[in-house]
């Protein structure tokens, strides 16, 4: 800030550009304890990109539309967010078909945030700036969370390592399925679906995001029938099984009641939806750790703000916040399924959830090094439009610490639900065996599956039914620094 705009002169200025108010500082060097946010800014016509960045910094920290005398009662120089870097996004602006967009780096002093509160963090970072007139569009692309701030959060209630130990499942991916149809079944028929899937070889069955307590099936009935199915399948197979009982409800009191009932029935896992809100998610995470329960999060609603490339919020930020909040599972994309998912972007999401230290990688959309300060890892969930014929691709893209959920790919099997589960389990174990033998399971994948199908009729039926079905639409959210490979998956 120039000297002439400090002191009394500053407060006679009325309305000043945000840059001159101190929210732009190209010489600023972020501290290790700063929270850093990276925004994609599309300025309004005639607005300088540095001024737009300064406006976002100001309105997400201490500024209002005019200078105020009460600044002088605070450590205002410290508490102002500093936009310190703004650069043109590749393939935008002059000479391209896209209007100019800019990556703006903004640093926030740690004292601006309440410890252990996602709600407070988000109230500043995304609370007011997205409707600001100086920007035509705004997207939060990434954040660097300092270790000092991470240490104020619980992190995942259970974590991948303890979950595998608790469930006694090692050396392979976990398998699951969402009960279908997700609405309309009676409690008893719902339980029958759960039993058939688990008996056939799945590790988990799951409620879908919008099954709560409706006239056709009260939540208590669903819990009772599902846990009866879990116990019978566990006894029949000798394996630990589970069902994600969705405890999402209209109030925290109701959610706690449902979670306590799930625990009393012997469930190892409960489920919530992203739409319940950040504070409710953190509250359920604390309950889950206290009660030794795995917490599964369905990302219901995320695409309303994460899918568009120029406005909203990248899903990698949600991954970071949810790891801090304390969930154990989160749906994070499949690459080959029916939902949005560029391969490089999905890799960035999975790395964010599973790394102890995430290295900066612009190709996968990770703009910062991130030390996770010993917070537990989150198990990603791949769900939506996947089937046994894609098993080699899923293993290649997603790694081993992931739950592969085949809903329609289990329950839509022509020989029935249990056969669908058998097909998925055999396909997975055939691929794991090939991997362990050192074979190129990606290149040989189709042949490995065909060989296994010679002695497994359910797998043969699955391969014949779904063949090479994929959903190869180009993603809307793609990497900025390398070409998208979505269409060639």
Curated annotation (Swiss-Prot):
Cofactor binding note of this UniProt entry: Binds 1 Mg(2+) ion per subunit.
HAMAP family according to UniProt: RuBisCO_L_type1
Reaction equation(s) it catalyzes: 2 (2R)-3-phosphoglycerate + 2 H(+) = D-ribulose 1,5-bisphosphate + CO2 + H2O; D-ribulose 1,5-bisphosphate + O2 = 2-phosphoglycolate + (2R)-3-phosphoglycerate + 2 H(+)
Family in the record: Belongs to the RuBisCO large chain family. Type I subfamily.
Subunit structure: Heterohexadecamer of 8 large chains and 8 small chains.
Obligatory cofactor(s): Mg(2+)
Any Pfam family hit: RuBisCO_large
Further remarks about this protein from its record: The basic functional RuBisCO is composed of a large chain homodimer in a 'head-to-tail' conformation. In form I RuBisCO this homodimer is arranged in a barrel-like tetramer with the small subunits forming a tetrameric 'cap' on each end of the 'barrel'.
Keywords (A to Z) from UniProt: Calvin cycle, Carbon dioxide fixation, Lyase, Magnesium, Metal-binding, Monooxygenase, Oxidoreductase
SUPFAM superfamilies: RuBisCo, C-terminal domain, RuBisCO, large subunit, small (N-terminal) domain
Binding site residues for Mg(2+): 206, 208-209
Protein known as: Ribulose bisphosphate carboxylase large chain
GO biological process, one term: reductive pentose-phosphate cycle
EC number of this enzyme: 4.1.1.39
Active site: 180, 298
Modified residues (N6-carboxylysine): 206
Residues of the site described as Transition state stabilizer: 338
Alphabetized GO MF terms: magnesium ion binding; monooxygenase activity; ribulose-bisphosphate carboxylase activity
Main EC class the enzyme belongs to: lyase
PANTHER family per record: RIBULOSE BISPHOSPHATE CARBOXYLASE (PTHR42704), RIBULOSE BISPHOSPHATE CARBOXYLASE LARGE CHAIN (PTHR42704:SF17)
Biological function: RuBisCO catalyzes two reactions: the carboxylation of D-ribulose 1,5-bisphosphate, the primary event in carbon dioxide fixation, as well as the oxidative fragmentation of the pentose substrate. Both reactions occur simultaneously and in competition at the same active site.
Binding site for substrate: 128, 178, 182, 299, 331, 383
Keyword Lyase: yes
């Amino acid at each position: 800030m120039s000297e002439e705009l400090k002191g009394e002169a500053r407060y006679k200025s009325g309305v000043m550009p945000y840059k001159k108010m101190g929210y732009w500082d190209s010489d600023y060097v972020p501290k290790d304890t700063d929270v850093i946010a990276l925004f994609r800014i599309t300025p309004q016509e005639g607005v300088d990109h540095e001024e737009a960045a300064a406006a976002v910094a100001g309105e997400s920290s201490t500024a209002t539309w005019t200078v105020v005398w009460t600044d002088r009662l605070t450590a205002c120089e410290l508490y102002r967010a500093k936009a310190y870097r703004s650069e043109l996004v590749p393939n935008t602006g002059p000479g391209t078909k896209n209007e100019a967009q800019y990556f703006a780096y903004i640093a926030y002093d740690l004292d601006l945030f309440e410890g252990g509160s996602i709600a407070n963090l988000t109230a500043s970072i995304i609370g007011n700036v997205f409707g600001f007139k100086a920007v035509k569009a705004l997207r939060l692309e990434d954040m660097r969370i300092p270790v000092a701030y991470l240490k104020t959060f619980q992190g995942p209630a259970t974590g991948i390592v303890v979950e595998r130990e608790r469930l006694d499942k090692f050396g392979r991916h976990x398998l699951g399925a969402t009960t279908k149809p997700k609405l309309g079944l009676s409690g008893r028929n719902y339980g029958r679906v759960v039993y058939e899937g688990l008996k056939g070889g799945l590790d988990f069955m799951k409620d879908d995001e919008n099954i709560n307590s409706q006239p056709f099936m009260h939540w208590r009935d669903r819990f009772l029938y599902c846990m009866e199915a879990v116990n019978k399948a566990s006894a029949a197979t000798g394996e630990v099984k589970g069902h994600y009982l969705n405890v999402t409800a209209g109030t925290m009191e109701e959610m706690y009641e449902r979670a306590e009932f799930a625990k009393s029935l012997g469930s190892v896992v409960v489920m919530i939806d992203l739409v319940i809100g950040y504070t409710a998610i953190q509250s359920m995470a604390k309950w889950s750790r206290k009660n030794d329960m795995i917490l599964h999060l369905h990302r219901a609603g995320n695409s309303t703000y994460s899918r568009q490339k120029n406005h909203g919020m990248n899903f990698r930020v949600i991954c970071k916040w949810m790891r801090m909040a304390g969930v154990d599972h989160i749906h994070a994309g499949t690459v080959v399924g029916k939902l949005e998912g560029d391969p490089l972007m999905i890799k960035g999401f999975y790395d964010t959830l599973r790394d102890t230290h995430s290295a900066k990688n612009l190709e996968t959309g990770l703009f910062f090094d991130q030390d996770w300060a010993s917070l537990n890892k989150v198990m990603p969930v791949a769900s939506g439009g996947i089937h046994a014929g894609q098993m080699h691709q899923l293993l290649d893209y997603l790694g081993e610490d992931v739950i592969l959920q085949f809903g329609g790919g289990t329950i839509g099997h022509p020989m029935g639900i249990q056969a669908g589960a058998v097909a998925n389990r055999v396909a997975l174990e055939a691929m794991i065996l090939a991997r362990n033998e050192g074979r190129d399971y990606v290149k040989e994948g189709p042949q490995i599956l065909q060989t296994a199908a010679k002695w497994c009729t359910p797998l043969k039926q699955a391969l014949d039914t779904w063949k090479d079905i994929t959903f190869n639409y180009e993603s809307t959210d793609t990497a900025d620094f390398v070409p998208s490979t979505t269409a060639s998956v």
